[in-house]
């Protein structure tokens, strides 16, 4: 098994970015003739992932992983990757994923390309196009490690339905130590986050105040 995705969830649902990763990972898995495997933490909804092309989901449930902390999450993802001989790990470009990526790269001795915007130009060697300079330019990155990590830029590939028969597997959390303890999390609700929005409208100082927003 060679392709693994990390699926983030919030408020009992998979994030849009998780379903985009499933769509993107499915396309690469089909090119390689391999299975697509997902890892989820404290969230069991395998059928949603199956709808977007995931063949197998590994569900890790543990009270200590209720809130995201980078090192324990990275340790568990690395353990799954090593146990399953993963050669390609795909993450989103969320803040949490960007915390995880360098930790995973060190643990797996992996190459890492962030902000990837489309399917690989080549799989041997792995060659990807990524945005850089705050999306003002693009660069081509060649990853030649045995294990590699892709950070997919949000909303760059989209959601593509590709239903599969899925196998669900429960896994115990790997023993880890952390110096951090999350006591409380406050999040806004009822609105679409900027990361998940299809269209973002931005207004500068020239608008002066909210009374002029109707102009754009």
Language model regions located:
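N-terminal glycine-rich FAD/FM-binding segment characteristic of electron-transfer flavoproteins
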Residues: 1-216
């Amino acid at each position: 098994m060679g392709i693994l995705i990390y699926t983030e969830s919030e408020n009992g649902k998979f994030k849009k970015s998780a379903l985009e990763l499933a769509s993107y990972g499915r396309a690469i898995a089909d090119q390689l003739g391999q299975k697509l495997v997902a890892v989820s933490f404290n969230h069991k909804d395998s059928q949603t992932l199956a709808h977007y092309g995931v063949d197998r989901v590994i569900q890790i449930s543990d009270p200590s992983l209720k809130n995201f902390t980078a090192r324990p999450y990275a340790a568990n993802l690395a353990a799954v990757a090593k146990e399953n001989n993963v050669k390609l790990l795909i993450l989103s470009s969320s803040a949490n994923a960007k915390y995880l990526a360098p930790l995973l790269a060190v643990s797996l001795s992996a190459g890492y390309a962030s902000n990837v915007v489309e399917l690989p130009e080549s799989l041997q060697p792995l060659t990807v196009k990524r945005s850089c300079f705050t999306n003002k330019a693009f660069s081509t990155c060649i990853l030649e490690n045995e294990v590699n990590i892709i950070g997919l830029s949000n909303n760059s590939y989209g959601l593509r339905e590709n239903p599969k028969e899925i196998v669900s597997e429960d896994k115990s959390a790997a023993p880890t130590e952390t110096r951090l303890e999350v006591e409380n999390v406050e999040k806004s609700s009822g609105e679409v986050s900027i990361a998940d929005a299809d269209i973002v409208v931005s207004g500068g100082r020239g608008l002066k105040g909210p009374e002029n927003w109707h102009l754009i």
